[in-house]
Amino acid sequence: MERYESLFTQLKERKEGAFVPFVTLGDPGIEQSLKIIDTLIEAGADALELGIPFSDPLADGPTIQNATLRAFAAGVTPAQCFEVLALIRQKHPTIPIGLLMYANLVFNKGIDEFYAECEKVGVDSVLVADVPVEESAPFRQAALRHNVAPIFICPPNADDDLLRQIASYGRGYTYLLSRAGVTGAENRAALPLNHLVAKLKEYNAAPPLQGFGISAPDQVKAAIDAGAAGAISGSAIVKIIEQHINEPEKMLAALKAFVQPMKAATRS
């Protein structure tokens, strides 16, 4: 959990925002997945947002659903994902690692056992996409017991009560939604979210990272100009994996070429 705090402190000193890529663990297979993650970090990723393949991904657009199917086709299991997380943590001791996932995966293991496992392998945060704030007590309590930051989504239409709850319960960072709906680079992030960012700051929420539809450097810059601490990009990255699925070296080169300008856009 502390890794987020030290990251945001360092970025502030350097007058930079955070660029955070999302990928699905095990896509397109364990070995290439590890290479992808190394490449993202080498290219400038400040933190990682990682998905665990799940059979019914509600909030995911077709791009990320396909990533899940590729991981399943490679025989990737949640247990293997935790082994991969432990390897990533060994190799990269300081980078914040977040999981973005669904409640069923937590229930399958048992809530407390799940967060204990996260702590053991060095996961810093967990966002459970299908658990609203008002139902989050057992999740966030288990998370805090195991030094894992509970992450909450702040939708563009959040009212004052919700903003106060997110500020009160969230740790690590706040996932600021560019718009409602499913993820996807096709639906470019729209409105600037200045008013939400201002409110979150007023209520001392964890730093907001804007996600959903972030696929170009100008959007990263716009998110930071609106007061966000950085931006999360998922579908655009997963699409690169899909496009070069049979050319692993080209895939890594294309990922590097995508991430470098995205990170550069975080520097003021």
Curated annotation (Swiss-Prot):
Top-level EC class as recorded in UniProt: lyase
Database matches in Pfam families: Trp_syntA (PF00290)
GO cellular component term of the entry, any: cytosol
Listed pathway(s): Amino-acid biosynthesis; L-tryptophan biosynthesis; L-tryptophan from chorismate: step 5/5
Entry GO MF terms: tryptophan synthase activity
Keywords of this entry: Amino-acid biosynthesis, Aromatic amino acid biosynthesis, Lyase, Tryptophan biosynthesis
The organism's place on the tree of life at top rank: Bacteria
EC id: 4.2.1.20
Active site as annotated: E49, D60
Gene3D superfamilies for the chain: Aldolase class I
Reactions this protein catalyses: (1S,2R)-1-C-(indol-3-yl)glycerol 3-phosphate + L-serine = D-glyceraldehyde 3-phosphate + L-tryptophan + H2O
Function: The alpha subunit is responsible for the aldol cleavage of indoleglycerol phosphate to indole and glyceraldehyde 3-phosphate.
PANTHER family from the UniProt entry: TRYPTOPHAN SYNTHASE ALPHA CHAIN, CHLOROPLASTIC (PTHR43406:SF1), TRYPTOPHAN SYNTHASE, ALPHA CHAIN (PTHR43406)
NCBIfam families hit by this protein: trpA
Description of how the protein assembles with itself and partners: Tetramer of two alpha and two beta chains.
Family statement drawn from the similarity comment of this UniProt entry: Belongs to the TrpA family.
Protein name: Tryptophan synthase alpha chain
Organism: Escherichia coli O1:K1 / APEC
